[in-house]
Amino acid sequence: VGQCGDGLQVLRAVRQSRPDVVVLDITMPGLNGLDICRDLSRKCKFASVLILSMHDNEQFIARALEHGASGYLLKGAAAAQLTEAVAAVARGDLYLGPGISRSVLERLSNGEEDPYDRLTSRERQVLQLIAEGRTNRAIADELGLAVKTVDTHRMRLMRKLNIHDQTTLVKFALKKGLVSLQ
């Protein structure tokens, strides 16, 4: 059992401790839970992911499942439900908490493409840090990159998303749940 303060710590901790189940929130600093989930499903197949989130929104739920989550439970669920969810995910079962709608599964089956999915992992990291209000210099320092490289990632992700200004970029990140207003 472990606890991490941000998304980058989660990736390091999972690689070191090799847990069977990782319980993640979607809204996390540094790297959001959806991107962590995607990375874990590709690089740490030994760990199943259960998303425990306040986001009761079919878009978030569908994206979590698309990114490799094995379960999704809303915060505020009873302790027994959390125990049941962890056990189900540990067995390799899919777990969706009560009230998670059929429309989520329908959305998954119709294959809608999300422009966010076209971004590289690094572009997603840069987008999240921009949305958190970091400057190019601060992003460069945090990710160990040159400022010019951060600027290049910013330009590429804006082009891929067809976004032309900072305000719209931050709105996009909020809508995707990369950051919250709290």
Region spans (language model):
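Acidic catalytic/metal-coordinating carboxylates
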Residues: 6-9, 32-35
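Short hydrophobic/Thr-rich beta-strand motif most characteristic of the beta2 strand and flanking loop
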Residues: 1-5, 13, 163
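Recognition helix of helix-turn-helix DNA-binding domains
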Residues: 135-168
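Conserved phosphotransfer cores of two-component systems
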Residues: 15-17, 39-46, 67, 176
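Short, flexible helix-to-coil linker/hinge segments that flank and couple to helix-turn-helix
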Residues: 59-66, 70-127, 167, 178-181
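Receiver (REC) domain active-site loop signature in two-component systems and cognate sites
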Residues: 28
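Active-site beta3 strand of CheY-like receiver
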Residues: 17-23
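Active-site residues of response regulator receiver
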Residues: 25, 53
